[in-house]
């Protein structure tokens, strides 16, 4: 599947833009942004965005009967395996949708669905702390570039 890319310097939320494209009839694509002003996390939480980190959403139609929970698991495995190529430290999944390194959160995945015209679509938002991480009281955070000598941008 070749996805069309949509790039923005600054937007509210990559997931919100992906949902807007779906509602306009664009059924697949990738949204990339340099900065989000209202990034979203699970259960209405805010994703704190810093310039230089990765903010993206992939959206597409789900054509088989796979459960949304399985899709969430698969997305976590894909992101974990991709990030593992950049460091020798073990990267782990903290269910349901967070990626940790050295017991610190570096990535969150937010999945949203849209049912439209008898079709099921999914939006997979990925927020990856590359160069800076927020200070959060409930859990420790960090950023990937701290743990790799490879250039990631």
Language-model regions: role of each:
Residues 131-140:
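Cytochrome P450 core scaffold surrounding the K-helix E-X-X-R motif
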Residues 1, 139-142, 146:
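RNase H-like, Mg2+-dependent phosphodiesterase core
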Residues 28, 119-121:
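Conserved catalytic motifs of the protein kinase core domain
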């Amino acid at each position: 599947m070749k996805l069309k890319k949509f790039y923005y310097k600054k937007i509210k939320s990559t997931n919100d833009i992906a949902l807007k494209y779906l509602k306009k009839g664009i059924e697949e694509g990738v949204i990339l942004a340099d900065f989000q002003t209202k990034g979203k996390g699970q259960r209405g939480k805010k994703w704190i965005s810093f310039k230089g980190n990765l903010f993206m959403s992939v959206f597409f139609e789900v054509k088989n009967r796979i459960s949304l929970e399985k899709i969430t698991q698969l997305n976590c495995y894909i992101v974990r395996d991709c990030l593992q190529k950049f460091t020798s430290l073990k990267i782990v999944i903290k269910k349901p949708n967070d990626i940790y390194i050295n017991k610190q959160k570096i990535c969150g995945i937010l999945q949203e669905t849209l049912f439209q015209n008898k079709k099921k679509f999914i939006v997979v938002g990925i927020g990856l702390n590359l160069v800076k991480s927020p200070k959060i009281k409930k859990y420790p955070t960090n950023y990937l570039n701290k743990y790799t000598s490879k250039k990631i941008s």
